[in-house]
């Protein structure tokens, strides 16, 4: 069979990790010995190959000499071949079959939809535990073939593949724990439920940017579909109903949820969104990446009760009654005006005179002196001011900085200001 034109995996490997481009690391086992090669071979006698090889965006179209791959890559455990020009699964198989320790393989953004994956080729992937096929447009038939030949696969990435439906294989994959299938076109729950059938041991499901419009499944059926699901991301889905959020309680092991950017929550403030979701999901310990503390949960549940306290009984969610049983009926919080005071009524003391007056707190000490000039008959340059807080245990505080704003003293109604002359 003729080797495809273009750059080979082996050629790129030698170029990138040659001693000239990748300084030799001294120490036992750091270098890889390569047997003598034909004259004119681009390989050096020793290369410094790490166990993680990153060969993305290198224009790779084919494998190259398999014996050389085996000699160089016996210890390699992670391989990134994303954004190359690999379109033949047979060439990918030549590479992978000669990397016996391989556990992580990234084939994203290679046009692998242009060829059919045969079972003999798929078998070379058998040791891989983490497989990335983002933007490869891999068909479900290809995915099924891979799943059958990867008994230890734990993580699978199928993002940006334009899936509108999900096809179930005849045999489910019990080993898979994490599935990223973001940025596809999976809008119907009937397609999402197939993932539960296909991957019964699934721990983490990332469905972001799929515009899922609803979770249409009886509660008991949801528990059977995803019995081990601990984390789900519905970021930028199309959910529009609180009933869909309540459905998440049917996943028996669910602890972590991501729900940013969904139509349902758009009308609410940031505080309302988080508190209302936390209150509806009693088992969730992490929301949108942030831990839900015991204190935050109690605050959210109390907020939830007050939020629905005036809603007609027929419209109150079931969770409201559960929380009433827990906390009892709560009165609405009193509205407290926390805006800073703009003025204060104070007593101005000068010699034996006491004058009650209102002063603006947004003015400075210098401006207050001008206001007092007529009252105390002193030039501002000869005026000393002292502020006395009637509730403070300390004595008067000199107001000696002319540019200091009065509100910074914490002046309140009933406080006193003493005026003295510098020259008595």
Curated annotation (Swiss-Prot):
GO cellular component assignments: cytoplasm; cytoskeleton
Keywords: Coiled coil, Cytoplasm, Cytoskeleton, Leucine-rich repeat, Phosphoprotein, Repeat
Gene3D superfamilies assigned: Phosphatidylinositol 3-kinase Catalytic Subunit, Chain A, domain 1, Ribonuclease Inhibitor
Listed SUPFAM superfamilies: L domain-like, Ubiquitin-like
LRR repeats mapped onto the chain: 73-98, 99-123, 124-147, 150-172, 173-197, 199-224, 226-250
Domain Ubiquitin-like, chain residue ranges per copy: 334-424
Tagged with keyword Metal-binding: no
Molecular-function annotations in GO: alpha-tubulin binding
Pfam families: LRR_9, Ubiquitin_2
Modified residues (Phosphoserine): 18, 41
Functional note: Acts as a regulator of tubulin stability.
Protein name, UniProt field: Tubulin-specific chaperone cofactor E-like protein
């Amino acid at each position: 069979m003729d080797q495809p034109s273009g750059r080979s995996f082996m050629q790129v490997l030698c170029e990138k990790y040659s001693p000239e481009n990748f300084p030799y690391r001294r120490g036992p086992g750091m270098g890889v010995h390569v047997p003598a090669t034909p004259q004119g071979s681009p390989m050096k006698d020793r290369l410094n190959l790490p166990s993680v090889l990153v060969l993305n965006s290198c224009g790779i179209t084919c494998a190259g000499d398999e014996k050389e791959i085996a000699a160089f890559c016996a210890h390699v455990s992670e391989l990134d071949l994303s954004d190359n020009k690999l379109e033949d699964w047979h060439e990918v198989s030549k590479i992978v079959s000669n990397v016996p320790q391989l556990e992580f393989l990234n084939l994203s953004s290679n046009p692998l939809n242009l060829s059919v994956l045969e079972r003999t080729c798929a078998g070379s992937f058998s040791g891989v535990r983490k497989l990335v096929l983002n933007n490869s447009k891999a068909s479900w038939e290809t995915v099924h073939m891979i799943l059958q030949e990867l008994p230890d696969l734990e993580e699978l990435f199928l993002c940006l593949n334009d899936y509108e439906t999900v096809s179930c294989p005849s045999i489910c994959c019990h080993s898979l724990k994490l599935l990223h299938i973001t940025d596809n076109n999976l809008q119907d729950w009937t397609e999402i439920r197939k993932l539960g059938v296909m991957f019964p041991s699934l721990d983490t499901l990332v469905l972001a940017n799929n515009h899922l419009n609803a979770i249409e499944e009886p509660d008991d059926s949801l528990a059977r579909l995803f019995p081990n699901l601990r984390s789900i991301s519905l970021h930028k889905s199309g959910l529009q109903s609180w009933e869909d959020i309540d459905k998440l309680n049917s996943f028996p092991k669910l602890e972590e949820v991501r729900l940013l950017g969904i139509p349902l929550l758009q009308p609410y403030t940031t505080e309302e969104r988080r508190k209302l979701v936390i209150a509806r999901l009693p088992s969730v310990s992490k929301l949108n990446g942030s831990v839900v503390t015991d204190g935050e949960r109690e605050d959210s549940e109390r907020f939830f009760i007050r939020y629905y306290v005036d809603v007609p009984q027929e419209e109150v969610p079931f969770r409201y009654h559960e929380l009433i049983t827990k906390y009892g009926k709560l009165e609405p919080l009193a509205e407290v005006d926390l805006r800073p005071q703009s003025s204060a009524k104070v007593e101005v003391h000068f010699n034996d005179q006491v004058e009650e007056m209102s002063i603006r707190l947004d003015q400075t000490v210098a401006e207050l002196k001008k206001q007092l000039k007529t009252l105390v008959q002193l030039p501002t340059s000869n005026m000393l001011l002292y502020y006395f807080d009637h509730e403070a245990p300390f004595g008067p505080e000199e107001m000696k900085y002319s540019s200091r704003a009065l509100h910074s003293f914490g002046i309140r109604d009933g406080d006193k200001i003493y005026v003295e002359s510098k020259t008595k």
